[in-house]
């Protein structure tokens, strides 16, 4: 297990912004989809790529193109280079980009004392080992008038000479969700990879759309409620990593065959014999394995009186093209546009003989209910479900999704040899992505105490064997 990461040597820290004059100074309001993220930790991710060249080649041949393409990308994804502005209450926070002044911090670093292969491995590693290759988001600036200005994003690219490169990102989630972040990364990747080619021959992703923020109307003071909670906390406190002790992170992959075995079992056991999706059955299996791990370690595991206790899982449904406004929110909308849904299953069902079926049925029912309902009408009740989730034992949520295509990020070096969603370590999250080998499997990231990780691994392997027979 990787126990410690020697801090990389900082080669350069600079500021990257859109080309001057290409984006006018712009203010964007926060929507009721953005407001819940005001008080939550940063969203951090790492992409590892094989790279056999020297530091000199990296600095001369790769970094300049990476910087230039990032600048062009920020011309279209400019809020990432801007600030989150937090005025004194009662004025609401908003996003602002100031042409010629705002930028994101871009760090170039070198690591010569850490084994790249161990760092990107799937095996358990202390959660702190990845923090050295994460960028440091600058602290907020507070004006004499008490207006707080928070940077939104920072990037860091670290070379491990002769072995690989890591591109790290840290951002406040209030500006946009994973759909937007994936869009941003793929646009940047496409520009970087196409360097030197005729622009007319380069196929780039569609441009993001910012203009429809004003049409996202709050259906019932949803955003106001989140603002009140944000103000009641210490809004001057800048969200950052608080590293729990004795925690490790590990990656597990379910192959296509293993997933198909799970799907067949669930379909056979289901009363209506309905087929189940890869996402649902994988999530059900991992959630059950995680809850079994946590309950097994709990002092209350033998208590019969808590058999009717309910465990909760938070899922998210993308509301793009689903909200009943005059016009739909387009798929390329820049911002947060996710509706939270709470899946609830009783303890005795989630730990019983047909636990995966119970979890799968509950997840499927919740998704169908959300997709068939008027999401705007249900929005005022989302907070009730989230509060119930927060107050429960072992609240679990999801980060990422296989459909985001997070391994489809070729900067001219080939696809990533590993991707990590780092912020799952802040508690209770399961990271999901497509498997990196392109076999239609699913990759899962988990953060737990070392002892619990061993238990989780054992329970997971037992489950895989059970459903293989």
UniProtKB/Swiss-Prot annotation:
Involved in the acylation of the 6'' position of the 3-O-glucose residue of anthocyanin. Also able to use flavonol 3-glucosides as the acyl acceptor. The keyword Transport does not apply. It comes from Arabidopsis thaliana. Pfam families: Transferase. Signal peptide: none annotated. One of its GO terms (molecular function) is acyltransferase activity, transferring groups other than amino-acyl groups. This is Coumaroyl-CoA:anthocyanidin 3-O-glucoside-6''-O-coumaroyltransferase 1. InterPro entries: CAT-like_dom_sf, Plant_metabolite_acyltrans. Disruption phenotype: No visible phenotype, probably due to the redundancy with 3AT2. Keywords: Acetylation, Acyltransferase, Transferase. Induction: Up-regulated by high sucrose and by low phosphate stresses. It comes from the Eukaryota. PANTHER family: PTHR31625. The active site is at 173 (proton acceptor), 410 (proton acceptor). Highly expressed in flowers, leaves and roots. Lower levels of expression in stems and siliques. The modification N-acetylmethionine is found at residue 1. It is an enzyme of class 2 (transferase). Gene3D superfamilies: Chloramphenicol acetyltransferase-like domain. Its EC number is 2.3.1.-.
